[in-house]
């Protein structure tokens, strides 16, 4: 069977929740069993968080950050196929490393005014898609050079000129796309945000 577990702090009876010892750093260390299938949803407020999801059995993921500094790692390959991973960042600094190990069919990102890095290093086993929406922040995409990449933008972006791509209208295609064994299909929507593509050797 399946079970639902909720961890966190919440107010009760319209009151407030306080944490004693405010002069000391408040630290939480949460670990999950690598034997259990996980549909994981996390929300981080004003905190500094490091989350390593490597080696777990992760079937879906939602990460939502507020005014925080968050790093999500896939240090090892996911033990099962992940259908979707969603990342939502407000005025936050978010770094996701090892998305190639996540084995997610689709990744979606929605960003506000923060700085975000999506790193696709890892052991790729299939093609994947990324839907990225960016308001006023900065988004850096780090992609292995062996991966074929297609980027489709909602509108023409004069400032978006990624190295190693050819452009046809609002569509950008990496030079190796036709011969690459693995592919990343990116749909990009941005207004005033800046997007950078960095190749990983």
How should each PLM-predicted stretch be described?
Residues 1-24, 72-201:
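Short, surface-exposed interaction patches in beta-rich subdomains
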Residues 37-39, 60, 179:
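Residue-level detector of solvent-exposed, low-hydrophobicity positions
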Residues 41-82, 86:
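Right-handed parallel beta-helix
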Residues 9-30, 35-43, 50-52:
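A cross-kingdom signal targeting lumenal/periplasmic-facing segments of multi-pass membrane
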